[in-house]
């Protein structure tokens, strides 16, 4: 692509109702200032994508339809998988390179002013006195602090909010200071005589985001020493507790992340050790456990390991788990499944719900799998959860949430609804003070989503697989920087306009996902419709011939 054309991407409807834009009728409050939709299920009409590129030669544009991006080349501009890992299909930009606009910005502003942004004022686990993560005491040393920091920190970087960034650094500086001579960092928690690494798994993600934003080399040193400690830990002491064992795939991703920066061979050995000691999510007709968050978060572990094993059976296993849980417990709108806290036979109808943690972890898994596989299925599924399920779990001002949200959610009260709901407690009520894990973990949802609105492709181009208003600075071709502006109210409207700005002429490919729910889509450049049959569930690859 060069620079000053207009591209129109036209996606007329199928003759069927779909649930992608299902909006709950819960409150007259409309913080996004967007017209309310009147129907629970809407008939898709038309999606229009306008694309402005600053050039004059339209007939030099070539559009092809592809199942996946071209991985025969290696991206020269961003850190990506190095051998022996399989090539990534898409590469995430560093946090902060994508700026939200429109409703995505409004949501982050609401989150900043809401529960996630002010959780430190009401959460005992974020109390800075006697806090194990700050080294001021021995309390609150498990998952809550890093859960909160995942969303809060990334929101701070995206908004470039100096006060929030300083608050984030307060916690991370304590993490740096906590590293022991043997490499372990953070509060040391034992369960059954073994170290519990689950809280540290989350914190390593916080550190990765901080490195992307700041370039602070202390992150690399800390993680290198910590993973050497993990490698030296006897296998009968490694990942044996329920949570860390179920979610070892998060550790595996962090190992890959560091390996792609340093190339240290010991990390490949540790990756094998991590996979070996993680719960088996490769079973054909059952799961290692039926906990909703474990499933939403851990079903991607086989596909993550596929990056190292290159065994297609590992990749297929992730798809199998995704469909297995939904074939039994997921015959409901919104992309999720009934597991409130755990999925149970006999409780398979729309009254069953999912934790708010389950929503955001499913979105994160979809985003990761989009990068690993390039399959547009994961982008579309992420949109489904993000637009239909996740918003229903919170009040419109994002100042309160509930633990369990069901597709057929007819009541929000503080009663115990067990055994209809698996977990005992007041878990259908909106409450800023309850739901300990979701209270801290919910904040990752929108920041992570925004970070995936624009991706880099292996062939030094740009990919847009999930749509939303934003502006991104992206390095393309041989390192030239372009700005891509996505102007849209999607999914509340059905048009998307792209403008690409550069200082010099530059050629690069652009991938646009063609949703499965459209008939006869088209692309128009500067008002002229391109003569090309687009295919649903694939990508339009636009390039200069």
Feature map (PLM): residue ranges:
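Bacterial Sec-dependent N-terminal signal peptides
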Residues: 1-60
């Amino acid at each position: 692509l060069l620079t000053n054309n207009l591209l129109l991407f036209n996606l007329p409807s199928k003759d069927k109702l779909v649930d992608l834009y299902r909006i709950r009728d819960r409150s007259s409050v409309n913080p996004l200032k967007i017209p309310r939709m009147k129907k629970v299920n809407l008939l898709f009409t038309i999606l229009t994508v306008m694309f402005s590129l600053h050039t004059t030669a339209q007939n030099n544009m070539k559009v092809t339809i592809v199942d996946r991006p071209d991985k025969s080349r290696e991206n020269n501009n961003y850190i990506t998988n190095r051998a022996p890992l399989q090539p990534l299909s898409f590469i995430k930009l560093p946090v902060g390179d994508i700026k939200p606009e429109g409703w995505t910005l409004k949501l982050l502003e609401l989150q900043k002013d809401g529960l996630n942004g002010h959780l430190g004022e009401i959460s005992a686990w974020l109390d800075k006195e006697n806090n194990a993560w700050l080294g001021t005491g021995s309390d609150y040393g498990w998952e809550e602090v890093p859960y909160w920091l995942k969303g809060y920190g990334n929101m701070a970087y995206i908004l470039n909010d100096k006060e929030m960034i300083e608050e984030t650094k307060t916690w991370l500086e304590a993490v740096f200071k906590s590293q022991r001579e043997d490499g372990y960092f953070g509060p040391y928690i034992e369960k059954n005589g073994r170290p519990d690494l689950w809280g540290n798994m989350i914190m390593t993600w916080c550190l990765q985001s901080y490195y992307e934003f700041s370039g602070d080399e202390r992150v690399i040193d800390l993680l290198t020493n910590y993973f050497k400690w993990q490698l030296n830990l006897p296998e009968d002491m490694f990942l044996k507790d329920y949570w860390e064992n179920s979610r070892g795939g998060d550790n595996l991703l962090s190992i890959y992340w560091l390996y792609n920066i340093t190339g240290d061979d010991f990390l490949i050995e540790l990756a094998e050790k991590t996979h070996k000691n993680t719960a088996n999510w490769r079973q054909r007709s059952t799961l290692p456990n039926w906990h909703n968050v474990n499933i939403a978060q851990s079903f991607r572990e086989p596909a993550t390991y596929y990056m190292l094993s290159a065994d297609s059976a590992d990749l297929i296993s992730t798809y199998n788990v995704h469909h297995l849980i939904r074939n039994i417990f997921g015959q409901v709108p919104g992309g999720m499944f009934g597991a409130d806290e755990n999925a149970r036979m006999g409780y398979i109808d729309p009254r069953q719900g999912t934790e708010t943690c389950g929503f955001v972890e499913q979105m994160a898994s979809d985003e990761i799998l989009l990068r690993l596989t390039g399959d547009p299925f994961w982008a579309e599924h992420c949109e489904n959860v993000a637009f239909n399920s996740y918003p229903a779990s919170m009040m419109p001002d994002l100042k309160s949430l509930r633990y369990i949200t069901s597709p057929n959610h007819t009541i929000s009260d503080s009663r115990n609804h067990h055994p209809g709901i698996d977990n005992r407690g007041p878990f259908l009520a909106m409450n800023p003070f309850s739901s300990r894990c979701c209270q801290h973990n919910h904040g990752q949802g929108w920041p992570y989503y925004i970070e995936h609105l624009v991706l880099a492709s292996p062939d030094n181009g740009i990919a847009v697989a999930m749509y939303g208003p934003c502006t991104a600075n992206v390095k393309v071709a041989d390192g030239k920087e372009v700005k891509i502006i996505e102007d849209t109210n999607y999914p509340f409207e059905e048009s998307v306009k792209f403008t690409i700005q550069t200082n010099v002429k530059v050629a690069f490919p652009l991938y646009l996902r063609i949703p499965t729910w459209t008939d006869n889509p088209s692309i128009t450049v500067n008002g002229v419709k391109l003569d090309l049959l687009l295919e649903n569930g694939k990508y339009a690859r636009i390039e200069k011939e």
